[in-house]
Regions:
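Transmembrane-helix motifs of polytopic, lipid-linked glycan transferases
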Residues: 9-30, 68-72
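Membrane-interface transmembrane helices that cradle and orient dolichyl/undecaprenyl
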Residues: 28-30, 69-84, 255
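Membrane-interface alpha helices of multi-pass inner-membrane proteins
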Residues: 39, 84-100, 110-111, 133-136
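Short acidic/glycine- and proline-prone juxtamembrane loop motifs at membrane-interface regions
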Residues: 51-61
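Transmembrane-lumen/periplasm boundary regions of multi-pass, lipid-linked membrane glycan transferases
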Residues: 94, 105-210, 220, 225-226, ...
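Short periplasmic/luminal acceptor-recognition loop of GT-C membrane glycosyltransferases, typified by
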Residues: 103, 295, 299-331
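Hydrophobic/aromatic-rich transmembrane helices and adjacent perimembrane loops
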Residues: 211, 229-266
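Signature aromatic-anchored transmembrane alpha helix within multi-pass, membrane-resident enzymes
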Residues: 257-287
């Protein structure tokens, strides 16, 4: 329609907010604007943050809340100010409302907190309060969920194929899941490779920053893998959209002493390549492939059905029954 541009703009606004808070968080970690900028630029090498961003959907909508949750949680751990913990509770609730898979990040943060409970014993009260804030915000949704027979949960389960039990799925789907993640991250690793002088990985297990970033980046993916193994669920690629937001920060922190800033020209060339390739590819596919959902003639079909109805009936169409796509377009 004529207002489709608004959805594309909204998507980019969400992405910009996300990148801004990734940069803000990275600045707290590195206290160096160059490394903070690199943390964001590296994301251009990940499929989810370039090619798929024009389409505004639940995967894009949860991006800023994912970044904000990590940022405010870290600020809460750093200062223990109730203000940051309240904000964490608010944005994490909105993130969960964007998509239930947001729970994987919240579980990762909880696991990190529990594993370091002795160090953060003074933070328990404020962290618990942030959880209470989230639950209060989520109460109306939980009531709606109960009254509507958990329809959104069953929708997700059906999309993952959990209801179709097959033992081989417990092996096949996790392998497919891991394989796809490796392929998706290849451009990211290329960008990292060109600026690293030596591949010496030294992880200080006592470094709070590294432990936190390992938790934020790896635990959600590990939990997703475990879910696929235990349930045989087919993890759809787009479900992983927010999971890699802080991967650049993690790798830069691990290899910080071996980053060669003299190679930045090569890095910028690769960055520009992926930065330009993404919109050009998206534009090309949009012009060539007319079977995408964005090209679905919903208004024309709706108008045709309405005209047929008016020719045969005098009353209005009050209810349209069908799946969310066809019935949604028709209504």
């Amino acid at each position: 329609g004529n207002n489709d541009w608004a959805y594309y703009l909204l998507s980019q606004i969400f992405v910009i907010i996300t990148f801004y808070f990734v940069w803000k968080f990275s600045n707290l970690v590195f206290e160096d604007k160059i490394f903070s900028l690199l943390s964001v630029l590296l994301l251009s090498g990940i499929y989810f943050y370039n090619f798929t961003t024009p389409e505004f959907n639940v995967n894009v909508s949860q991006l800023p809340f994912w970044a904000l949750s990590v940022y405010f949680f870290w600020q809460g751990l750093h200062s223990n100010k109730k203000f940051y913990w309240i904000l964490f509770g608010v944005v994490s609730a909105f993130g969960f409302l964007s998509k239930y898979l947001f729970i994987y990040l919240l579980l990762a943060l909880l696991i990190f907190f529990i594993l370091n409970i002795k160090k953060y014993s003074k933070f328990i009260k404020n962290y618990s309060f942030s959880i209470l804030v989230s639950l209060i915000i989520l109460i109306p949704h939980f009531i709606w969920l109960f009254e509507n027979n958990f329809v959104t949960i069953f929708y997700g389960l059906n999309r993952s194929g959990v209801s179709d039990f097959n033992f081989i799925n417990h092996i096949k789907n996790p392998i497919i899941f891991l394989s796809k993640q490796i392929v998706i991250l290849i451009p990211f690793f290329i960008m990292i490779f060109v600026i690293i002088r030596k591949f010496k990985m030294r992880i200080n297990v006592k470094d709070k920053k590294i432990l936190f970033l390992l938790s934020v980046n790896l635990i959600p993916i590990l939990l997703m893998l475990i879910t696929s193994i235990l349930t045989g669920a087919k993890i759809r690629t787009m479900w992983m959209t927010p999971f890699y937001l802080f991967l650049g920060t993690l790798f830069l922190l691990i290899f910080k002493n071996y980053i060669d800033l003299k190679k930045m020209k090569i890095f910028y060339r690769i960055f520009l390549f992926f930065f330009i390739l993404s919109p050009m590819t998206y534009l090309g596919i949009s012009l060539i492939d007319k079977t995408k959902r964005t090209d679905y003639p919903g208004k024309e079909i709706s108008r045709l059905v309405q005209n047929k109805w008016d020719d045969n009936f005098s009353n209005e169409i009050k209810i349209v029954i069908g799946d969310e796509w066809y019935a949604g377009n028709l209504s």
